[in-house]
Amino acid sequence: MLGLQIFTLLSIPTLLYTYELEPLERTSTLPEKELGYWCTYANHCRFCWDCQDGICRNKAFKNHSPILENDYIANCSVYRSNNFCIYYITSIKPHKMYRTECPQYMSHEWHEAVIRKWQKLLTYGFYLVGCVLVANYVRKRSLQTIMYLMVLLVIFFLLSQLMLYRELEDKKHKIGSIPPERELEHWCTHGKYCNFCWDCQNGICKNKVFKNHPPIGENDFIRYDCWTTHLLNKCNYEKIYKHFDTHIMECSQPTHFKWYDNLMKKQDM
């Protein structure tokens, strides 16, 4: 009984943490408080941008690079059920659908710290429950039974470490798919979901370019291998996942990329 009580107490904060968001009917007009969530994944959707005189600024991330309005910014609608979120790109037909799991990302700013905290608390809690159970058996069982329990506890320890703290497998990028470091800011402004824009460790991914960008959990939002191509006046990147999807933009966008301006000046000389 004591072990069950301890487990129940440990489960309460976990249930509170994973409390599901309220359902949201499909819409292209979002509550302002949810922009931070949706614009983390669907950054190219029009509801994330405030465009005036051809210059677009990100509504959710104020220090995000401004861009010129072009076909990168797509019309989108979003939908949320009890256990997952979906956003649709409606600018093209058939509409493209992308799915993310909502309960993991209720608040990005404290997500990483909280998830690690509760992982540790749950692990220690399981160990405590195991020790209490072993202590009860010590008084009632034989030495052989106790040894079996100790072996099971060790196996449980190893499995819990594997499940809670497993390291991500190193992803192999395709040859030529990773742009030079000096160009990451350009590519990750437009191809934000490309995996070369993210540093993922222990299931938590941080943006390499925008340091104040909220960390996100690794999911199929960033599973794309991307190819990048530089032309004289155009740039394009291709998402390579279930099928090829090419996006084209002008390389001079955003205009503050001085390295590109300098490069073009040298070519003109």
UniProtKB/Swiss-Prot annotation:
Short name of one Pfam family: v110
Signal sequence annotation: 1-26
- Domain of life of the organism in this record? Viruses
Q: Which residues lie on this side of the membrane: Extracellular?
A: 27-117, 167-269
In what way does this protein cross or attach to the membrane?
A: Multi-pass membrane protein
Gene Ontology CC terms, in alphabetical order: host cell membrane; membrane
Q: Where in the cell is it found?
A: Host membrane
Stimuli inducing this protein: Expressed in the immediate early phase of the viral replicative cycle.
Q: Which family is this protein grouped under? A: Belongs to the asfivirus MGF 110 family.
Question: What role does it play?
Answer: Plays a role in virus cell tropism, and may be required for efficient virus replication in macrophages.
* Record's protein name: Protein MGF 110-1L
Q: Which organism is it from?
A: African swine fever virus (isolate Tick/Malawi/Lil 20-1/1983)
